[in-house]
């Protein structure tokens, strides 16, 4: 009885120590150059090198390089680069263009930007200037027809011009052009006298607009310098 017990115990120990088939360096997947009943297993059957489940190189589940779940490069769940689920965290979106706050402030203080005129603004209504043209006929003509001439001018921000003359020249041209086109479409025409008088009137209004815009521009610049000085910044930080 004792001998039978010892023999049975020995058989159980040998069964536990016996290696399982299919492990490293077994007949199921040997290193290249080692013969095996299954033939050369390099690369292993049913997948490429390092393919546990039939995927490509380094593909645990059939995805691409470094793809745990079938997404693209660096895609944990099938989204784009840097996309956790393809719906957010898209850091590579182009950033929105920044708005020039200086020009916005200038436009708000001066007038509305006119659509379709390439950034020109329309100034506030003015009283038509009192002008003497050097002869009684033109003086009288102006007094009788001044309502036909513009009382607002078109202009660009003053910081886009190197001097007053350039500002005024551009202001006069665009204002007369727009006023002439608008008035002509209503069936009203201008004579040579009208054009001559209108040029003088609009020029004076553009000079007034330039002086107004220049003053506002330098005031805004002074305010920005004041608030950007270190003592003011320090004071604001304690408020």
From Swiss-Prot:
Disulfide bonds join 171-206. Residues 1-15 form the signal peptide. GO terms for cellular component: Golgi apparatus; plasma membrane; side of membrane. Keywords: Amyloid, Cell membrane, Copper, Disulfide bond, Glycoprotein, Golgi apparatus, GPI-anchor, Lipoprotein, Membrane, Metal-binding, Prion, Repeat, Signal, Zinc. Cu(2+) 4 binds at residues 77-79. It is found in: Cell membrane; Golgi apparatus. Belongs to the prion family. This is Major prion protein. The lineage of its organism: Eukaryota, Metazoa, Chordata, Craniata, Vertebrata. The gene is PRNP.
């Amino acid at each position: 009885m004792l001998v039978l017990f010892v023999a049975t115990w020995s058989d159980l120990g040998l069964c536990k120590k016996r290696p399982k088939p299919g492990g490293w360096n077994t007949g199921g997947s040997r290193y290249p150059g080692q013969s095996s009943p299954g033939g050369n297993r390099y690369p292993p059957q049913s997948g490429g090198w390092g393919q546990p489940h039939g995927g490509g190189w380094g593909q645990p589940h059939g995805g691409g390089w470094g793809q745990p779940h079938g997404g693209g490069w660096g895609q944990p769940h099938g989204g784009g680069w840097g996309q956790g689920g393809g719906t957010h965290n898209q850091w590579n979106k182009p950033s929105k263009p920044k708005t020039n706050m200086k020009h916005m402030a200038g436009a708000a203080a001066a007038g509305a930007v006119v659509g379709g005129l390439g950034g020109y603004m329309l100034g506030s209504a003015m009283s038509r200037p009192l002008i003497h043209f050097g002869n009684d006929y033109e003086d009288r003509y102006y007094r009788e027809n001044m309502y036909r001439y513009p009382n607002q001018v078109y202009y660009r921000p003053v910081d886009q011009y190197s001097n007053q003359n350039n500002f005024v020249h551009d202001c006069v041209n665009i204002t007369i052009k727009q006023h002439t086109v608008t008035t002509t479409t209503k069936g009203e025409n201008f004579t040579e006298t009208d054009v001559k008088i209108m040029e003088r009137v609009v020029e004076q209004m553009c000079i007034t607009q330039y002086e107004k815009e220049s003053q506002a521009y330098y005031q805004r610049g002074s305010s920005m310098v004041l608030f950007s000085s270190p003592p003011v910044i320090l004071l604001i930080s304690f408020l």
